[in-house]
Curated annotation (Swiss-Prot):
EC number: 6.3.2.8
Keywords, ordered alphabetically: ATP-binding, Cell cycle, Cell division, Cell shape, Cell wall biogenesis/degradation, Cytoplasm, Ligase, Nucleotide-binding, Peptidoglycan synthesis
Principal location: cytoplasm
Signal peptide coordinates: none
Record PANTHER family: UDP-N-ACETYLMURAMATE--L-ALANINE LIGASE (PTHR43445:SF3), UDP-N-ACETYLMURAMATE--L-ALANINE LIGASE-RELATED (PTHR43445)
Annotated residues for binding of ATP: G118, T119, H120, G121, K122, T123, T124
Catalytic activity annotation: UDP-N-acetyl-alpha-D-muramate + L-alanine + ATP = UDP-N-acetyl-alpha-D-muramoyl-L-alanine + ADP + phosphate + H(+)
Name listed for the protein in its UniProt record: UDP-N-acetylmuramate--L-alanine ligase
Amino acid sequence: MAFDLLKDINKKVHFIGIGGVSMSGLAAVLLNAGYKVSGSDSKESEITNRLKEEGAKIYIGHSKDNLQDVDVVVYTAAIPSDNPEIIKAKEDNLILMDRAEFLGQIMKGHKFNVAVAGTHGKTTTTSMISHVALSADLDPTILVGGDLDIIHGNFRVGNSEYFITEACEYKQSFLRFFPYVGIILNIDADHLDFYKDINHIKDTFKQFVKLIPNDGYIIGNADDKKVMEVLEVAKCNVLTYGINNGDIQARNIEFNEKGCATFDVFRNEEKLLSLSLNVPGMHNVSNSLSAVCLAEIFNINADAIVSGLSSFGGAHKRFEYKGTKNDITVIDDYAHHPVEIKATLSTAKKMNHNKIVCVFQPHTYTRTKTLFNDFVKCFDDCDELVLMDIYAAREKDLGEINSDQLGDAIRAHGVKCTNVHSHEEALEYVNANLSKGDLLLTVGAGDVVKVGELFLN
């Protein structure tokens, strides 16, 4: 495997934030190819220990002294410009690259790059596709945005021309990629701390489509009008899917008591196969159809598709079963956008339960402010909402928005909602208000999962 950028240097690469989900996968790919890798992170973790075992030099904490005999420094968007290692790299005139650009360089070393894009469902769909590719013995390299049991983590290094990765639109990251197959699951307003409006987002997705070579493919969700609008700029092959529209469709859909679907897959009027999923929700029927589209492109047979998709039980933090206590079921979900929350609650509603209690932690002030009205209306399917303070992530609190304001609006909308200001307060509510047969959902991209863990323990 060759990287254009690294051809003429001594192959010593340092990752700032090497313990992160995306960075660790890149580091593993390099280690496997024989490069010397070092990296720093704020804390030790399973990921840093795994990389250390594979030969990486790991530093805990950030310091100028960590850049020992290094040629290239890779960083993520989350690393501030005053990070001492960034400053040192600039002082020493080292090659400094952000994660997306570096991932693009790695993709150049593969022929069949699959980039999974969309506002929602990237991790789940990338995981589904990975299951199918492994079932078909394609021996792919995989980078996924969450832990996947079949690859024992968030990355897998293969020895073939196949490379499967998520393609995030935040700060136009995916425009640094070299996809042979692009997949667009859906397009909604998000990351409005960067994008001006939905048209800005659509224009960026159009640029993503234009990256694909003429002999490549774009796969798009035909049930999403914005996706179909974006696909109009395609010069490559186009394949669409949907529940109600598209080249590849799901028909005769039935759900079991866990909310998981069994259905037939058709291409035009030809039945291709029948599928039974092990992940719940109509949105996962849709996601699975994109995997069938990819299988069609790579001539993967029906047995491998069925085997791959039926063996997928979900990615971590995606409607993940955490446990049961006193006949109360606890499920954790990463949903942090109103469209995702609606899908999660709709899925929960199909399960056997008495009442659904949702503990939600809003993620970032910008998202909460810009999508405020959508957040107000997205909790109609839960019986009781426990609303935590906003999780700041990369942002500072400018005093423009808070969870109490959101709670007032949700209550005015008619949903039973209680504001809490700590995990312990949320736990008190759960202990006092849930009973046998209830469903506890912890929802959000921050650390709301702790509420369910505290309850179970």
